[in-house]
């Protein structure tokens, strides 16, 4: 399970270097939050994280309910990126130096081109929207990096890497470390939350039927590429994964946590029954 992101903007304890030499930064504009990471890369490709920041965002709520980003959503994003820009200036980095990517909320927003233009004009950042297949590949690279000292997790048996986002769930299937397929499923926490809100006007069993139907459809799609009963390693990424790891262990992890299968299933069942 991936490393924990802080929930508020804060300065790193590492200290602020005086120049941008060897420094890189990236920003992800996601459905539920906007995240920044600053890192130093040495001549051998080694990575040292210097700073992280994250802020909650309403973009997914806008797009998945109205189909477009609201004016308030745009203003909120500009304010967050402007605060990130101030932090980056301390590292000698300018908005034009930063890789900024947008995921499912921006992919689906009907006014995404206008949004990107406004962000560039008002905050100075150029936003690149990544398609779902690239997002899944980036997820794979992140997992490989996090598990570089424990590569057998991905090579000793068939594996599934899964990230549940606000708008989509990204899934990759690996057969002894080799990618078999990747899928972007239209199942996300914000979409499900909207269905739960609507289910207040439906019979009590509606939401359970909705989830079972969507999960069964997803499993049928995945099983065409690799029998799911042959998957023995399950890698879960994202805030829900970090929450589960914390609840089951009582502590945070710098890169990943290994959870007992039976305990995880029991925990998931308890959450479903709440």
Model-identified regions with their sequence ranges:
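N-terminal basic/disordered segments at the start of proteins
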Residues: 16-48
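N-terminal glycine-rich anion-binding loops that anchor highly charged ligand groups
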Residues: 45-57
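Hydrophobic residues embedded in beta-strands of well-ordered beta-sheets
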Residues: 34, 47, 169, 179-180
């Amino acid at each position: 399970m991936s490393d924990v992101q802080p929930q508020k903007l804060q300065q790193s304890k590492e200290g602020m270097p005086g120049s941008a030499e060897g420094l890189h930064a990236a920003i992800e504009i996601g459905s539920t939050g906007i995240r920044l990471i600053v890192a130093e890369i040495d001549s051998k490709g080694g990575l040292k994280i210097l700073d992280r920041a994250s802020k909650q965002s309403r973009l997914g709520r806008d797009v998945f309910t109205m189909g477009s980003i609201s004016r308030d959503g745009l203003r909120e994003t500009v304010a967050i990126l402007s605060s990130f820009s101030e932090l980056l200036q301390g590292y000698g980095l300018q908005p034009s130096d930063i890789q900024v990517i947008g995921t499912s909320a921006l992919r689906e927003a009907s006014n995404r081109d206008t949004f990107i233009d406004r962000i560039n004009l008002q905050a100075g950042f150029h936003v690149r929207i990544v398609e779902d297949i690239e997002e899944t590949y980036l997820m794979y690279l992140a997992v490989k990096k996090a598990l570089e000292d424990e590569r057998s997790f991905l090579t000793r048996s068939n594996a599934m890497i899964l990230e549940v986002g606000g708008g989509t769930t990204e899934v990759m299937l690996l057969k002894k470390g080799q990618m078999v397929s990747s899928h972007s499923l239209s199942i996300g926490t914000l979409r499900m939350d909207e269905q739960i809100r609507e289910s207040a006007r439906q019979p009590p069993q509606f939401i359970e039927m909705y989830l079972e139907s969507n999960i069964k459809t997803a499993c049928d799609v995945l099983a065409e590429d690799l029998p799911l009963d042959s998957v023995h390693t399950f890698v879960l990424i994202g805030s829900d994964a970090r929450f589960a790891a914390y609840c089951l262990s009582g502590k945070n992890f710098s890169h990943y946590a290994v959870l007992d299968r039976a305990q995880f299933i029991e925990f998931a069942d308890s959450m479903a029954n709440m």
